[in-house]
């Protein structure tokens, strides 16, 4: 899956407080060849709020993973279904394995 490919490139930053709600939602737009046209953090305003430094670090690491994984291996059919995606990067889910 596309999510599994990107998560395989994601290095979760060390030292984050994983008891917090550290869910980063990212909207992706893809070309038919799997290249990312645009990646946008949906809770972008949260990155600049006081006390949200951990969230910002995690969000930046998720965007980095998307860049590193390009081009994604995408299905040869159904472009209309997967050209725009929303991915949820949840550090707690990743740490559970």
Positions of predicted regions on the chain:
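Conserved "boundary/linchpin" sites in short secondary-structure elements
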Residues: 4-11, 27-48, 63-97
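Short secondary-structure boundary micro-motifs
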Residues: 10-13, 55-56
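Short loop/turn motifs at secondary-structure junctions and domain boundaries
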Residues: 16-21
